[in-house]
């Protein structure tokens, strides 16, 4: 598995805590089996249990679906975890869209990356961990020679991604039963 060479961090205050006691937010590529398991548990909780995607039941009832796919076994894929202090509570995944990337590859996939499976546990969403996770993924892909990254974003998160410098392209498309917007970011100025 490729590993980016830097760690990303930010601070945020927890409700009920003094602003003088910051919550340290960090993002790192998965390095241990325990971190990899935590990455997949968070994805399952958010996408299958909460959102009912990938064959799960919406609203936390059931949730027997599986959000894993062939990219999870790709040695070029980077699985990222986000922590609030020492608690793993967020994830994102990125991988190159090379000429052998199957249906994900376009006619000119060289230098293109895809970011997906961005998830933060509900009880931690108020901390703002999503932005450091996205920035970590963008920076990692850029440092590995990427020139463009794409992601398919749920409509509720389009403004958030635009705020982070992403641009919309095309119309909404269906993905796992929900509408998603294809968005792109130029990686050439991100390192």
Where are the predicted features?
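Short hydrophobic/aromatic beta-strand or adjacent loop that forms the aromatic wall/cage
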Residues: 75-79, 178-183
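Conserved beta-strand in the GNAT
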Residues: 81, 86-97, 102, 112-119
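Conserved active-site alpha-helix within GNAT-family acetyltransferase domains
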Residues: 143, 155-179
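Conserved N-terminal entry element of GNAT/NAT acetyltransferase domains
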Residues: 1-33, 190-191
